[in-house]
Design a protein with these regions (language model features):
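Structural signature of tandem-repeat unit edges
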Residues: 7-21, 31-44, 54-67, 76-90, ...
Length: 185
């Protein structure tokens, strides 16, 4: 755990191909890190593993990854896109919060647990909205019918001004619209 925590001057890191485990907050607040490839043997990204890597612009996740922990990419302020492998079966809430450059999240069609609709991350069943990319174009968003829950910090920092909620919505997570420009919901 916390192997490289707060190594602010670390700009490059080559993780060994044999690596299988990253500890909680292993690279948290490595503010100078710009790119990273997670080795193929890593199956789980723990909570806050890359949180605060504000200069990270390129990230490659392994095809066999199964779990992305809570806040794993929180405050990765320079990432513009994230591609979630088909093998991922769990994504913790706030995994993609406070990412002001995030334009889109990609999920492969063969992922059985998650999907994206116009770059917005939802469970495959479409009942939970987990993350809305901060810089997604437009000032209005209609939450898809069938969504019953909006995750914690899901719309953090969005430039949306208008959000329409479906009749199906039952729960809005903590601080779901924190630091957004929302005027009408």
């Amino acid at each position: 755990d916390r192997a490289f925590l707060n190594c602010q001057s670390l700009t490059e890191l080559r993780l060994p191909a044999e690596l299988e485990t990253l500890g909680d907050r292993a690279l948290c607040d490595c503010m100078g890190l710009t790119s990273l490839t997670v080795p193929d043997g890593v199956r789980e990204l723990p909570d806050l593993v890359f949180s605060g890597c504000v200069s990270l612009t390129s990230l490659t996740l392994p095809a066999g990854l199964t779990s992305i922990g809570r806040g794993a990419f929180c405050s990765c302020r320079s990432l513009t896109e994230v591609t979630i492998p088909d093998s991922v079966q769990f994504i913790g809430e706030t995994a993609f919060a406070d990412m002001p450059c995030l334009q889109t999240i990609h999920v492969g069609a063969d992922n059985s647990a998650y999907k994206t609709v116009d770059g917005v991350l939802l469970t495959k069943a479409g009942d939970v909205l987990l993350a809305y990319p901060t810089t997604r174009p437009g000032i209005r968003y209609d939450v898809p019918d069938g969504v019953t829950r909006i995750g914690e910090l899901a719309f953090y920092g969005s430039g949306l001004m208008i959000v329409r909620f479906p009749q199906s919505l039952r729960t809005v997570g903590d601080e779901a619209f924190e630091d957004s420009t929302l005027l009408v919901a």
